[in-house]
Amino acid sequence: MATKAFQKIYTKISQITKATCSLKASGVGYDELAMVNGKLAQVVKIMGDEVTLQVFEGTEGIPTNAEVVFLGKSPTLKVSEQLAGRFFNAFGDPIDGGPEIEGQEVPIGGPSVNPVRRKQPSELVATGIAGIDLNNTLVSGQKIPFFADPDQPFNQVMANVALRAETDKIILGGMGMTNDDYLYFKNVFSNAGALDRIISFVNTTENPPVERLLIPDMALTAAEYFAVEHNQKVLVLLTDMTSYADALAIVSNRMDQILSLIHI
């Protein structure tokens, strides 16, 4: 991410942990992005003029006199019809070798819908899988968890749901995937000729675990765009939530915090 010449540069970090660094700064907002010694970071705590940044790649190699530049914005996603059929990382950048997305830039992680104002869920989302449609029915507007042992083929089940679901768009959020898992989904969707209605946000095991925490917000921001702006039926698939919980544990450990079970 490029920085602008007029942005203030801070060079005095007061505290560094394995995942965060703290410094005194002014005019900074919560969730704002920053560059710390060339590494992308995000504001996670503000107490007066003391700002704590979570560094996505970890703080290894960052000195106390490192240059810190705040970017003046929180994580965003460019939304348009061009998202369809593409694969992105946790920051919404293409990872499939295709062109950059042109569209409206919207912040992720916005306020959730007031549940009192929502309509009663009643519309079936058919998957063509009897065990799901009859015993664990997907209904538009609801969240349904799927539990599986590590040795069960849950990726194949997720791919089948994506291909068979009677929806306009499928948003896949992959967290902690192996490269084999990523290539499996990419090849299955491509071979089935279904890429034009599937949008994928992927964090692999080669990426920093902290980035997994952005995947659900990216996926839901894209889903909201197609559902609200285009009145389309959208199904969001997030896999796997165990990796998401592991990322929370890793972040808490690196921030020298005691992990509370309430977080997961």
Give each language-model segment a name.
Residues 212-247:
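Phosphate-binding/switch loop-helix module in NTP-utilizing enzymes
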Residues 169, 197-199, 231-235:
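Loop/turn-to-beta-strand initiation segments
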Residues 2-8, 12-127:
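Acidic-enriched and Gly/Ser
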Residues 153-196:
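Conserved P-loop
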Residues 95-142, 158-160, 196-205, 211-214:
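P-loop NTPase nucleotide-binding/switch module
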Residues 262-264:
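Conserved small/polar residues in nucleotide/adenosyl-binding loops
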Residues 179-222, 254-257:
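Nucleotide-state-sensitive switch-loop elements of NTP-binding domains
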